[in-house]
Structure formats: C-alpha cells, structure tokens
Amino acid sequence: MKKIRLFCFFAVALLFLTACTPKPNMETLLSYQAPGTEMTIRITDTETFYAKIKISENEASIIFTDEKREGIAYRMDRDGQICMFFEDVEIPLASSDELKCKDWFALFSIPSGDNIWKIKSETIGGINVYVCRDEKITLYIDAASGLPLKIETEGIVIDVLEAHKKSADG
C-alpha cells in the first residue's frame, strides 16, 4: 500500500512539474520591438487616433490612417530626433520634448532591463496572454505570437488592431 501511495505521489509531482512552463523574460516578450515589426494601432490619448507603426533598423515611423490626419507621419531615429512628414515634405523638429508622439514612440522602445516587471499568465477573452506590469506601464502580449495586444500607461492606451513581425529571412 505504501508503494502505491509513494508511486501516486511521485506521479502527481511529476505531472505538476511538467505542466508548469516557465514564463518568458521581458527581453523575450519585448522582441516585437525588433526591426521588421508593423502594427495597425488605435491610440487613445485625450483623443483617439488610428495609425500604423513601422519599426526598422534605424528608426520607427507612425503614419496616421484616420480620416482627419491621413497622410501625416512622424519618424523618430535611434538618437531620438523626430521629423514630421506630409506628402513629400519633411520637417525636422528641433525640440520634440513636448510632442505627444514622443510618448507614443517610447511605448515601442521599452528597455527590458531598466524596470522591475511583474509577469502574469492570464486568459483574456479566450486568448492566452502575458500581462506585464511595472510602475507605469501595463503590456498585454499574445502568448502564442509574442505580439502586443494592448499597451497602457499614464492616460495613454494603445490597442494593437493588427500586427506582423517579419522573420529574419524576409
């Protein structure tokens, strides 16, 4: 009888250990910020805007797609310099500290090691997601694809409506 109990205990313990998969770290979860990622987003920040964000090797671009702002785009390079575009006109912005788009760009270039993150695995609306929280930011990342679903911080909500991450081979 003792052998059966011991066997059952080890079987349950083994089952429990194999069922628990480790959570990925923030570096892995933030890999959607790599070059080649394109997203259709809805930004809610005092107003609601629709845009596409494209992340390349040296810069990120936000191209507005809503009727009111269609054709206007902002591009920020890796040094933090922002240019505004409309059709073929490029306007470098000397002081971009007060621009709201700088806050939006920051949400797509979050450093993984600077913050203490709490990572929780949840099921929301039938989708397995990682909910990642630090002092200011909450990220909802699709567990299957590794792409963000929603980003929230200090009055800004970015809903990712569609996302694509290009593979290394194109």
Report each predicted region and the residues it spans.
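Flexible, processing/modification-adjacent segments and terminal tails
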Residues: N25-Q33, M84-E135
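Well-ordered beta-strand positions enriched in small/hydrophobic/aromatic, beta-favoring residues
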Residues: M39, Y74, Y130-C132
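Sec-dependent bacterial lipoprotein signal peptides
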Residues: M1-A19
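Short, surface-exposed coil-to-beta transition loops
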Residues: E47-Y50, R69-I72, D134-I137
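Gly/Pro-enriched, hydrophobic low-complexity segments
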Residues: S61-D66, W117-G170
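An acidic-aromatic
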Residues: K52-A106, E154-D159
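Small/flexible residues
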Residues: R5-F7, T44, D77
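N-terminal leader/targeting segments and the immediate start of mature chains
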Residues: L14-E59, V89, S95-S96, K165-G170
